[in-house]
Amino acid sequence: MRIIPLSIVLLAFSAPAVAQVIGKTFPEMEAETVEDKVVSVPQDTKGKFTLLGLAYSKKSEDELNGWFEPIFYKFIQKTTGLMAGFGYDVNVYFIPMFTGINAAATGTAKRKALKKVDPQLLPYILFYKGELKRFKEELDFEKKDIPYFFVLDQNGKIVFATSGAFSESKLDQIEEVIE
């Protein structure tokens, strides 16, 4: 009988800590495109819903890459024909974060992205170089090996947060918030 209550307690405490950030304004972050254009989040994204995917380790970046294709087809690719009016008007950015000693690798990562990433995706990838501590504290980044996703409303307030590998259920939850 003790197994059931213990498993319920463990399940309750395993809920993503990122849920604690809902309602907060996303902290200011300046990041760059592969062409070195600076984008300030959330300042430059106001007026539209914004989906952000952040990763700050090689392993989490690999998981972040698993989100590229499904998010591209769901939110970025423009529909044509009969479905032309049913696309989403949303900002989408995938942000690998280069901090500490890894900050020096930002330029190399940009050049690598130019060579290896589908050109259609490049405008949606931002490179952050700077400190991590503030974001870890304000966004409840607890595990470095997973990516974190945030949906911001038109004013930059976090209205949804999730983390980890891609799943259809997570994508459905994001879509519900954006609709």
Task: Give short role names for the model-derived ranges.
Residues 1-5:
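Positively charged n-region of N-terminal signal peptides that target proteins for export
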Residues 44-68:
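Short active-site neighborhood of thiol/selenol oxidoreductases, capturing the structured segment around
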Residues 134-137, 144-179:
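Thiol-/selenol-based redox modules, centered on thioredoxin-like
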Residues 60-118:
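Structural microenvironment flanking redox-active thiols in thiol-disulfide oxidoreductases
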Residues 101-145:
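Thioredoxin-like thiol-disulfide oxidoreductase module
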Residues 18-42, 66:
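N-terminal "domain-start" segment that seeds a small globular fold
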Residues 6-7, 17:
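Cleavable N-terminal signal peptides
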